[in-house]
Swiss-Prot record:
GO CC annotation terms, alphabetical: cytosol
Residues annotated as transmembrane: none
An individual GO BP term: regulation of carbohydrate metabolic process
Protein name: Translational regulator CsrA
GO MF term set: mRNA 5'-UTR binding
Keyword Repressor: yes
NCBIfam families in the cross-refs: csrA, PRK01712.1
Pfam annotation, one family: CsrA
Protein family per UniProt: Belongs to the CsrA/RsmA family.
Keyword Cytoplasm: yes
Gene that produces this protein: csrA
Length: 62
């Protein structure tokens, strides 16, 4: 796992098209903004896990 330190307003790049910006920090919560192309899915981990659990086995999604 890569661990980075960023301050509010600073951005990191993932590949050429995805940016993650620290928008704010309040207590133990960090607000981040993600800018990615429409074809790149971005979910919180708990939402992604729910989506995966709801997929029907053998369903391709196409």
């Amino acid at each position: 796992m890569l661990i980075l330190t960023r301050r509010v307003g600073e951005t990191l790049m993932i590949g050429d098209e995805v940016t993650v910006t620290v928008l704010g920090v309040k207590g133990n919560q960090v607000r981040i903004g993600v800018n990615a192309p429409k074809e790149v899915s971005v979910h919180r981990e708990e939402i992604y896990q729910r989506i995966q659990a709801e997929k029907v086995p053998g369903q391709s999604g196409f």
